[in-house]
Amino acid sequence: MTFLQKHHGQMSDSMLTAFFIILSGGLQDAYTYCCRGKVFANAQTGNIVLLSTHLFEGDWGQALRYLVPVLAFLLGIYIAECVHRHFKRMEKVHWRQLIILAEIVLLAAVGFLPETLNTTANAVVSFVCAMQVQPFRKVRGHAYASTMCIGNMRSGTEALCAYFHTRDKEILHQALTYFGVVLLFALGAGIGSIATLHWGAGTIWLSCGLLTVSFLIMFIHDEEQKLNE
């Protein structure tokens, strides 16, 4: 089996769709950290630690910087779930595509925000990350996260341990899928960190491009299904 093998079933769960979504997730995190005041868009654990640290130091201004993305992340999950509940029966466009489209529009706007609005930019990116992680939770039938690594690392290592005890090739394939997701996220973060040196705030538009590819891939799969019917 190849890493980007042909997928049967929902294209939103395919590795091909996830490939670009995961790269985008890594890029977004590097973007807010490198270009928007060292705030994490995805890793809310880090933001909560820093929020708590500044609160106990009595530094309310710095605490607010980390509170805003945390609240935006929660709101993003809520909105994504509302979209799912209201549009899950749509036929022409999949509800997950609506999420991606909203992400593209919001991230495109972030690229125009000046440094003086970094708090706003970070809030929007965190909101987008939450919208992304909520609907895209499976790849090749396995639960995963496209915007953070700790769960994928745990699942991959657990599967690898199971493989060494059972020698089940399917379990090995599962482990490699998880570690592949982590590597893709790291690649996206690396691309984002380098790109910010050259393009600054506009780097986030690369993420828009990656998400656009995923958006179109889901259309292509729908057309293939219609031709096969």
Language model features: what each stretch is:
Residues 70, 74-78, 182-190:
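Hydrophobic/small/kink-forming positions within alpha-helical transmembrane segments
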Residues 78-91, 196:
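Helix-to-loop junctions at the C-terminal end of transmembrane segments
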Residues 104-118:
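C-terminal ends and interior cores of transmembrane alpha-helices
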Residues 1-12:
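Short, Lys/Arg-rich, polar N-terminal cytosolic tail immediately upstream
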Residues 98-105, 202-218:
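Symmetry-related core transmembrane helices of the 12-TM Major Facilitator Superfamily/SLC fold
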Residues 12-61, 136-173:
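Small-residue-rich hydrophobic segments that form or flank transmembrane alpha-helices
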Residues 92-101, 122-124, 145-149:
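Cytoplasmic-side transmembrane-helix entry/capping segments in multi-pass membrane proteins
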Residues 91-97, 190-209:
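A membrane-interface helix-boundary motif in multi-pass transporters
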